UniProtKB/Swiss-Prot annotation:
Record-annotated disulphide pairs: C5-C19, C9-C21, C14-C26
InterPro entries (UniProt xref): Cyclotide, Cyclotide_moebius_CS, Cyclotide_sf
Described purpose of this protein according to its UniProt entry: Probably participates in a plant defense mechanism.
Keyword Disulfide bond: yes
Record has Amino-acid biosynthesis as a keyword: no
Pfam families: Cyclotide (PF03784)
UniProtKB keywords: Disulfide bond, Knottin, Plant defense
One GO BP annotation of this record: defense response
Modification after translation: This is a cyclic peptide.
Chain residue numbers at which the record places covalent cross-link Cyclopeptide (Gly-Asn): G1-N29
Organism in which the protein naturally occurs: Viola arvensis
Domain comment (free text): The presence of a 'disulfide through disulfide knot' structurally defines this protein as a knottin.
Family: Belongs to the cyclotide family. Moebius subfamily.
Protein name: Varv peptide C
Length: 29
């Protein structure tokens, strides 16, 4: 739903629950 999780994932991982890496930012449905 919310496209931006407020987290970047240049390293390849997201720490925010429910977010996945869509390089270079974390996204969620």
């Amino acid at each position: 739903g919310v496209p931006i999780c407020g987290e970047t994932c240049v390293g390849g991982t997201c720490n925010t629950p429910g977010c996945s890496c869509s390089w270079p930012v974390c996204t969620r449905n």
